[in-house]
A protein has these predicted regions:
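Active-site neighborhood of HAD-like aspartate-dependent phosphohydrolases
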Residues: 1-42
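Asp-based, Mg2+/Mn2+-dependent phosphohydrolase catalytic module
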Residues: 1-4, 96-99, 103, 112-216
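Hydrophobic residues in well-ordered beta-strands that form the structural core
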Residues: 16, 107-109, 182
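An amphipathic alpha-helix signature
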Residues: 22, 26, 49-54, 70, ...
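Alpha-helical substrate-recognition element adjacent to the catalytic core
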Residues: 23, 31-67
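A short, Lys/Arg-enriched amphipathic alpha-helix followed by its capping loop at the start of a domain
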Residues: 27-32, 93-103
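Metal-dependent phosphoesterase signature
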Residues: 35, 56-93, 101
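Short beta->alpha linker loops
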Residues: 44, 48, 72, 86-90, ...
């Protein structure tokens, strides 16, 4: 058993899903008579479905229940990813190198299980452990998702490399005590003590000791 593990975020980190979410959110808000912009989407980056629904309800021009809005949104995004899910550059290659290095690895996402399962079915990506919004009482930026992933994978958080693309995800992983590698997608993420920031998954390498910046 390896002494270290790798914990991957999903949306924006492994898959280029933010344009897909923007498409689905825009369609839902059009049904509710309200505009939706990229600035609105940035407010929700790395957050939970409940947070998205609350934000969208506040902007809606027509009445709708939270459950109905959530159902519309999840139906739209799930149908979209079943057709095609664009991977981020280097995602499949990094996962393959993590597997070859014998590193246990988990997927840690704020998305619902229905969406996560659709993404995994579409991409064929495989993980030793899966943690989604359905598995926790508090999602990112709370540390619970990463604490649960570390527990399930059997490696202390301090020995887990957490790869994230959003400020909420980085906050979650750092609060859990993980070694954070940030790969910003939509929102910039600055350097901080103990945090590695790279431009792309292509800038990372995996070996038996974990994940590091290529050339570093």
């Amino acid at each position: 058993m390896s002494d270290v593990a790798v914990l991957f975020d999903m949306d924006g980190l492994l898959i280029d899903s933010e344009p897909l979410w923007l498409e689905a959110e825009t369609a839902v808000m059009a049904r509710l008579g309200a505009p939706w912009t990229e600035a609105d989407q940035r407010q929700l980056l790395g957050g939970s479905l409940d947070r998205s629904v609350s934000y969208m309800l506040a902007k809606a021009a027509r009445p709708v229940t939270p459950d109905t809005l959530a159902a519309w949104l999840m139906a739209g995004i799930t149908e979209r990813v079943r057709r095609d899910v664009p991977l981020q550059p280097g995602a499949r290659e990094l996962l393959a190198s993590v597997t070859r290095a014998g590193l246990p690895h988990a997927l840690v996402t704020s998305s619902e299980r229905t969406f996560m399962d659709a993404v995994l079915a579409s991409t064929g990506l495989r993980f030793d452990v899966l943690v989604c919004a359905d598995d926790v009482t508090a999602t990112k930026p709370d540390p619970e998702p990463y604490l649960l992933a570390a527990k399930l994978i059997g490696v202390p958080p301090a020995d887990c490399f957490a790869l994230e693309d959003s400020p909420n995800g980085v906050a979650s992983a750092e609060a859990a005590g993980c070694r954070v590698i940030a790969v910003p997608s939509v929102v910039p993420i600055g350097p901080a003590p103990g945090r590695t920031v790279v431009r792309s998954l292509l800038d990372l390498r995996a070996d038996a000791s974990g994940i590091s910046a290529a050339g570093g």
